[in-house]
Amino acid sequence: WRVIHTGSGHLGLEVAKYYQELAYKQLKDINALKMHEPHIPKSLCYVSGQAFKDYIHDMEIVQKYAELNRKYIADTVIEKMGWHICEEFQTIHNYIDTKNLILRKGSVSARDGEKLIIPINMRDGSLICVGKGNPDWNYSAPHGAGRILSRSEAKDAVGIDEFRESMKGIYSSSVMESTIDESPMVYKPMD
């Protein structure tokens, strides 16, 4: 198996931030019409109506971009290596299943019989799994075990030497200061 783990290259975050700002502005406009303005954090504001439809539309474009990006990377590597594809599939995480309106943050689709990948960390690899289709879990599975440290905490707590030591025996061109926030020790262990 060869796994390509990449997303939209920051584009999804920019689209989400745009609509979060729009939601906050709409809330402020509504509150300006009222006497009492309750404080609602920006992160809890949401869009509705046409803005919601526009957001879903734009996120579909971002998700298609990420899918095509992974496909291009895979096709290029396969061609250059002279490999033959026996089977391929994509698993995406931190996205909106726009067909079923399921937000998957930290999870992946796991419909009954669906093949999926659950990445553990850069050292321990990924699990190739088959979905169970559990409606109580929104037909989802976890995207890995989760973080122990946030990205900023990891940069303060983990040194490059510790990172390199944890990756001994694993080939990677990505063990560097700028990827400390992805080092194995910032994630929960598999067990």
Spell out what each predicted region is.
Residues 1-191:
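Domain-length cofactor-binding catalytic modules of enzymes
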